[in-house]
């Protein structure tokens, strides 16, 4: 293989793997707001004490939660971190879980607030209009996802395989 071809392959791999390279430690950057891999990892661990989640799902929720929470606030059904902490305390008590509510991360509380808001949004009469507003706002987000997590398309972080990796038949 020629030296220039090898250099081109290495450069392509570096560019592909370097998504979020300007933000070291980032799982994603959303409209300039960095979501760190440590935030995703911690929220995943904390949420797995309640139910089963994976890092991609957690990252997806952290990307879209601000949009949902903002829309919920506009509808008068916004949820706060304090409400999420109270909800978590109730869940812990009902399920006899030993959680230190004072150390739960803001990311986990944001995801719980997001979930609470979504549940109330489902009860609204005009959910079609709301859904369209949410889709439009989410589509307008400038999202850069670390390739370790995949890519953000259609409001979900999904696994991707770089085109330079050949899949087995």
Where in the sequence are the language-model features?
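Generic N-terminal initiation segments characterized by hydrophobic and/or small/turn-forming residues
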Residues: 8, 12-14, 59, 106-113, ...
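A C-terminal, polar beta->alpha supersecondary segment
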Residues: 25, 65, 69, 73-74, ...
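N-terminal targeting/tethering segments
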Residues: 21-110
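Residues at structural and domain junctions
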Residues: 6, 26, 58, 119-120
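Short, low-structural-confidence N-terminal segments
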Residues: 1-53, 139-169
């Amino acid at each position: 293989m020629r030296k220039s071809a090898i250099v081109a392959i290495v450069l392509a791999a570096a560019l592909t793997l370097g998504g979020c390279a300007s933000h070291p430690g980032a799982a994603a950057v959303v409209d300039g707001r960095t979501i760190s891999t440590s935030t995703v990892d911690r929220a995943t661990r904390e949420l797995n004490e309640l139910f089963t989640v994976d890092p991609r799902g957690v990252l997806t929720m952290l990307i879209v939660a601000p949009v949902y929470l903002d829309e919920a606030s506009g509808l008068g059904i916004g949820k706060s971190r304090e409400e999420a902490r109270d909800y978590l305390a109730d869940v812990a008590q009902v399920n006899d879980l030993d959680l230190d509510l004072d150390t739960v991360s803001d990311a986990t509380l944001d995801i719980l607030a997001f979930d609470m808001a979504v549940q109330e949004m489902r009860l609204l009469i005009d959910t079609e209009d709301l859904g369209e507003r949410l889709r439009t706002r989410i589509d307008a987000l400038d999202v850069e996802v670390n390739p370790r997590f995949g890519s953000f398309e259609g409001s979900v972080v999904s696994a991707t395989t770089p085109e330079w990796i050949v899949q087995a038949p």
